[in-house]
């Protein structure tokens, strides 16, 4: 694994998207799709607004990048997420050709602040572990200052 010096700057952007989403009463997750130092797409978790369990921030960012570029192929791009992506997001990134994923907050931090989810998160965690075994080194945790801010903001507002 390697840590690109620009990872931290983009991770801070993803964290800020997540903080803004939490302040708006939505789930506290944000993501970017980046290639060659350019942001191709941004996304936030829209599950509550859209009543859609697949509307994760990472999937939203991938959809927006694909739409902006009129393609389904994001080869060479990096998924930058405010929090450790679940299996759904990992698979979506792989299908889009994204070869590298970096994230700020580990899922354990999110669960410590938000509590365990009621959304099948155990299933997603099991699937996540299986995926990582298939493609070792693709997903990288980059410790980032402020990675807990989105969850703290969400907890301050209370669950919707």
Describe every region a protein language model picked out.
Residues 63-96, 100:
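Helix-adjacent hinge/juxtasegments
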Residues 46-59:
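A short, polar/charged loop-to-alpha-helix boundary motif
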Residues 47, 81, 105:
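Residues that line or immediately flank small-molecule/substrate-binding pockets and catalytic motifs
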Residues 23-26:
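A short helix-loop-beta-strand connector motif used in the catalytic cores of GNAT acetyltransferases and
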Residues 29-37:
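Short beta-strand scaffold segments in enzyme catalytic cores
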Residues 1-21, 91-160:
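Zinc-dependent deaminase
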Residues 14, 18-21, 31, 57, ...:
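Small-residue (primarily alanine) positions within well-ordered alpha-helices
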């Amino acid at each position: 694994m390697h840590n690109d010096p620009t990872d931290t700057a983009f991770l801070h952007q993803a964290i800020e998207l997540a903080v803004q989403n939490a302040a708006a009463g939505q789930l506290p997750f944000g993501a970017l799709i980046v290639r060659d130092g350019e942001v191709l797409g941004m996304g936030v978790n829209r599950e509550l607004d859209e009543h859609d369990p697949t509307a994760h921030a990472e999937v939203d960012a991938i959809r927006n990048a694909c739409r902006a570029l009129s393609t389904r192929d994001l080869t060479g791009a990096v998924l930058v997420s405010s929090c450790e992506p679940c299996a759904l997001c990992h698979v979506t990134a792989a299908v889009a050709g994204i070869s590298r994923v970096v994230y700020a907050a580990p899922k354990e931090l999110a669960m410590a602040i938000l509590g365990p989810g009621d959304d099948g998160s155990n299933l997603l965690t099991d699937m996540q572990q299986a995926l990582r075994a298939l493609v070792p080194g693709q997903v990288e945790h980059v410790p980032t200052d402020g990675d807990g801010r989105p969850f703290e903001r969400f907890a301050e507002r209370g669950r919707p």
